[in-house]
Design a protein with these regions (language model features):
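Alpha-helical membrane segments and immediately flanking helix-loop junctions
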Residues: 99, 103-104, 113-118, 132-139, ...
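Membrane-embedded hairpin module used as a gating/binding unit in multi-pass transport
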Residues: 192-266
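Intrinsically disordered, low-complexity non-transmembrane regions of multi-pass membrane transporters
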Residues: 22-38, 44, 203-232, 266-272, ...
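Entry/N-cap segments of selected transmembrane alpha helices
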Residues: 124-144, 296-323, 375-379
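Hydrophobic transmembrane alpha-helices of secondary-active transporters
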Residues: 53, 76, 101-125, 258-261, ...
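Alpha-helical transmembrane segments
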Residues: 181-199, 310-317, 343
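Transmembrane helical segments that form the transport core of multi-pass membrane transport proteins
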Residues: 237-326
């Protein structure tokens, strides 16, 4: 009968449904853990690097506003099939940030506005001859450009060489403009060496100077710089830089615009916003964005170690260039006018760390040897010189 037939088929139908449900469950369960099969040892290495950056940011307080997002981002983008970066036709948010703020160099330039608003060029304008040390301390960039040319193509070599400026935004801008495939490694190297200034610079300085030279006192006589001079300075520097190295106009212009906000006297609230809110926000976005380029396939390779080594060479030779230039000048100066060669080491762009390191070393040799005003002035000149050097590199590579 019809009723008996339905009884016969009902258990079989339920059994098939149960089998189908079981199959769906196991398929779903397998899908949840399928990414484990896609995990590689290189990704695990990147997790370790990300964890190290987070540790340095939190425990050692080394550039926390940058290294913390960079470290977390490095973990984020090295998860199998990570949704944070573009996968196939699906655009990831970090990839979108890169396109919006890095592919057009917008983030580094906005950061330069904040940096410019932080810098007081007054001490440098009191003694403009100190700008020579900023120029001399860029020697390592061009030495490393020559050296890196043996291992990389010239555009990558130029991007790596700019690490020596100890200026993260300039390094990012140059590497991104030249479309270097090593952007992530270059940024990690640049900011790592900036943070390691108190460790890297003192041994180089001691190696190149005698105790007598390190004890040379340089009494500071405060000059008079008018407000008009401070306002005209960023405008004049931008025009001169544009005429000498047109490729540097964006870098120099945004840096000097930030300084003009500081000095004009009518935009104090905007100046404070640029120094605090803008600079911190852009630094945060930079860290996350560049982390998107720190995928295992791009980062875990022998080239990365070579880039770190070349960056260290550039940094050391920049420091040496400034010190040796001061020693050269001393050959032509009378006994009472000798310069303390250590101030030349502050000509790199790591502001204000390098200036403080030099002052601390001076006080360690002689507790009455105050070099801070000179070293900070040279450090400020290094900010301008590193940006000009980056622009010159871009002009040479054009």
């Amino acid at each position: 009968t019809l009723w008996q037939g339905s009884l016969f088929f009902l258990p079989q139908h339920q059994n098939k449904r149960r089998q189908k449900n079981n199959m769906n469950f196991w398929n779903t369960f397998a899908a949840l853990f399928s990414n484990f099969g896609a995990l590689t040892w290189q990704m695990v290495v990147m997790w370790g690097i990300g964890a190290l950056l987070i540790y340095l940011a939190i425990v050692k307080k080394m550039e926390p506003s940058l290294l913390l997002p960079m470290g977390f981002g490095a973990i984020l983008v090295n998860l199998p099939a990570s949704g944070a970066i573009t996968q196939g036709d699906t655009v990831g948010p970090i990839s979108a940030l890169f396109e919006a703020g890095m592919s057009n160099e917008l983030f580094p330039l906005l950061l330069f506005i904040g940096i410019g608003a932080m810098i007081d060029f007054g001490p440098l304008l009191e003694k403009p001859w100190l700008m020579l040390f900023g120029a001399a301390a860029q020697f390592g960039i061009f030495f490393t450009l020559f050296l890196a040319g043996f291992f990389f193509d010239m555009k990558d070599a130029a991007s790596i060489a700019v690490i020596g400026a100890a200026d993260g935004p300039t390094a990012i801008f140059v590497a991104n403009t030249l479309k270097s495939q090593y952007l992530g490694a270059i940024m990690v190297a640049a900011y790592s060496y900036m943070a390691l200034v108190p460790i890297v610079q003192p041994p180089v300085i001691r190696l190149l100077t005698t105790q007598k030279e390190r004890r040379i006192r340089m009494p500071y006589e405060k000059g008079n710089v008018t407000q008009l001079t401070k306002i005209l300075f960023p405008v004049v520097v931008t025009v001169v830089a544009g005429l000498v190295a047109p490729a540097s106009v964006a870098l120099v212009g945004f840096l000097m615009f930030g300084n003009l906000l500081r000095e004009c006297g009518v935009l104090n609230s905007l100046s404070e916003t640029a120094q605090n809110v803008l600079a911190n926000l852009i630094t945060l976005l930079l860290g996350l964005t560049v982390a998107g380029q720190m995928t295992a396939d791009k980062f875990v390779r022998p080239d990365t170690l070579l880039i770190m080594a070349l960056g260290l060479v550039a940094f050391i030779f920049d420091t040496a260039g400034g010190v040796l230039f001061a020693k050269l000048l001393n050959l032509f100066l009378p006994e009472g006018k000798k310069l303390n060669p250590m101030i030349g080491a502050a000509g790199i762009s790591a502001f204000p760390m390098s200036g403080r390191v030099v002052n601390k070393m001076g006080l360690a040799e002689d507790n009455q040897n105050f070099l801070l005003m000179y070293s900070i002035s040279v450090n400020v000149s290094g900010q301008i010189a590193s940006v000009l050097a980056g622009g010159l590199i871009l002009s040479l590579m054009a």
